[in-house]
A protein has these predicted regions:
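Alpha-solenoid helical repeat scaffolds
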Residues: 1-222
Length: 222
């Protein structure tokens, strides 16, 4: 009898393990924790790497709200996994676990580490999340707001320059520029959006806020 298993293509085992790990994470995210645990057990029995197993285990722990244990595993994964997609997922999940503990500073540290360690072009979502956290911190910490807004500006401009120029990214950039009193730059961003999306009222509204802010700053409106 011919052994068809012996003729499996190169990388077949890795593809199977990746599929099992992906299924386990999907089940965990869907709230099917018992089934996710079964897939994790299968992953371990088939000799998957520590990194793959730890990432799945961390996802399950996080969804069970065991954030301390989940974070400990995510941090292990940072040094165990080389696949950029899995590593990116680990950084985002770890940051979310920290936020679920109301520890924004830890989340920021994790995201900054991800931006530094992930390959160029693979840290887009980390930058998006980090920019959002910088804006939140600026809004809550008036004394250091300028510093936080400046960090957010740098991240958002990097995203736009890299091609990730979504409406949300550009609107956030306009908001940050306005907060830093860079009115002409903010106006340019909004005008570009108005020209590109003429039926979207959000840009007209933000342009109006920008004008009012300028008038107040100049003393014309009190």
């Amino acid at each position: 009898m011919r052994c068809w298993n012996c003729r499996r293509p190169s990388g077949y085992r890795e593809q199977v393990l990746k599929a099992i790990g992906g299924l386990a994470i999907a089940l965990a995210n869907d709230g099917k924790l018992e089934e996710a645990q079964q897939e994790l057990d299968t992953l371990q029995k088939k000799g998957a790497s520590f990194g793959d197993c730890d990432l799945v285990a961390a996802e399950i722990l996080s969804l069970q709200k065991n954030y301390d244990q989940a974070l400990a595993l995510y941090i292990k994964v940072f040094n165990e996994v080389e696949d950029p997609q899995l590593l990116s997922h680990a950084y985002l999940s770890a940051a979310n676990a920290a936020l679920n503990q109301d520890d924004m500073e830890k989340a920021v540290r994790i995201l900054k580490q991800g931006c530094q360690n992930l390959p160029e072009g693979q840290a887009v979502l980390q930058k998006v999340m980090l920019a959002d956290l910088m804006m939140q911190q600026a809004a809550s910490d008036k004394e250091n707001a300028e510093e936080y807004y400046a960090e957010a500006q740098q991240l958002l401009e990097e995203l736009v320059d890299s091609g990730y120029d979504t409406i949300a990214t550009r609107l956030n950039l306009a908001t940050v520029l306005q907060a830093l009193d860079q009115y002409s730059e903010a106006e340019k961003v909004l005008k570009d959006l108005q020209e590109q999306y003429p039926s979207d009222y959000r840009f007209d509204m933000q342009m109006a806020y920008l004008l009012i802010d300028q008038l107040r700053t100049s003393g014309w409106l009190k």
